[in-house]
Amino acid sequence: MSELSFDAPVWRHGKALRKGYTTGSCATAAAKVAELMVLRQHLIHQVSIVTPSGVTLCLNVESPHIEGQQAIAAIRKDGGDDVDATHGMLIFARVTLNDSGEITLTGGEGIGTVTRKGVGLPLGSAAINRTPRHTIESAVREAIGPARGADVEIFAPEGEVRAQKTYNSRLGILGGISIIGTTGIVTPMSEESWKRSLSLELEIKRASGLTRVILVPGNHGERFVREQMGVDTQAVVTMSNFVGYMIEEAVRLGFCQIVLVGHPGKLIKIAAGIFHTHSHIADARMETLVAHLALLGAPLELLTLVGDCDTTEAAMEHIEAYGFGHIYNHLARRICLRVMQMLRFTKTPPVCDAILFSFDNHILGSNRPVDEIAKELQC
């Protein structure tokens, strides 16, 4: 494994987690060492780069090869202890020296192609983001000097398969992975990078002309929208646990309608004013159900049963048995009220709707008729 010059771990929930480096750092290092091999005409087995964040990486080189004025080298991606679809794959650079004075950068096998607006790259270009483009070109220019030129191709033979485990297809990046990384370093389980990837999907939807968006916690919500609402899932964006953040991003981007769709296990937290729904931040599901059941006049016996439940599903069984299923419409209205309270200082707040569904894809409740909401979404 490559030696890192940033050994200090990141601590999460009492665990020491190892940092890693981005595909952008891999591509930069591969391009730099390939160019150096052309110039020196001998194989190099280790290369160092300075990342945009100022961290020095000393990385092992794999599959080095020289043929005249062209060289190929690979760096193995190491995501550290982060959950990363590209971890362990090889990122290659093929560099050909010329006398043009210009550096050209292209994406080859396994590097995605941009097919939609909104990711900050021209349509049809390789999915190599701006910061990696700059670091690759700077590293090559430093090696070859001001007069020479070079053609640089970044490729990743496993890229197309690995990309199926990423958000790329939803972002309109097809055929492979993206070469990304603004700092060059992967921070284990970085919440900010996760939120940013979700927000990017919102930006792409807005750039495509959509003005109404459906925010769901995960894949189950998207399936419900498709099967039970009959609405094009192009309008669906995953918000994960970051409800407040994604609502604020939707407002920033100018969406006129936000529809929150999900299972009560996630969405009822919003009725209590909880806008980060991960259980390690806040729970209060049973407390919220008990409070609103009490407001609807539920008997003490039901309140006690629900309060003692460990799961929302178990609580829902008691609610159904006692005939209080109308609580879900009440909760949906409360969710919308809480969202509007959060956005009370927004100059032009969007319309907010909420739909709750069961694990077997049945509608439990909504703030207004679901057919009415679906019709507006299809406009």
From Swiss-Prot:
GO terms for molecular function: cobalt-precorrin-5B C1-methyltransferase activity. Pathway: Cofactor biosynthesis; adenosylcobalamin biosynthesis; cob(II)yrinate a,c-diamide from sirohydrochlorin (anaerobic route): step 6/10. It holds the Pfam family CbiD. It is an enzyme of class 2 (transferase). The keyword Transport does not apply. Its EC number is 2.1.1.195. It catalyses: Co-precorrin-5B + S-adenosyl-L-methionine = Co-precorrin-6A + S-adenosyl-L-homocysteine. It comes from the Bacteria. Keywords: Cobalamin biosynthesis, Methyltransferase, S-adenosyl-L-methionine, Transferase. One of its GO terms (biological process) is anaerobic cobalamin biosynthetic process. Belongs to the CbiD family. HAMAP family: CbiD. PANTHER family: COBALT-PRECORRIN-5B C(1)-METHYLTRANSFERASE (PTHR35863:SF1). This is Cobalt-precorrin-5B C(1)-methyltransferase. It comes from Salmonella typhi.
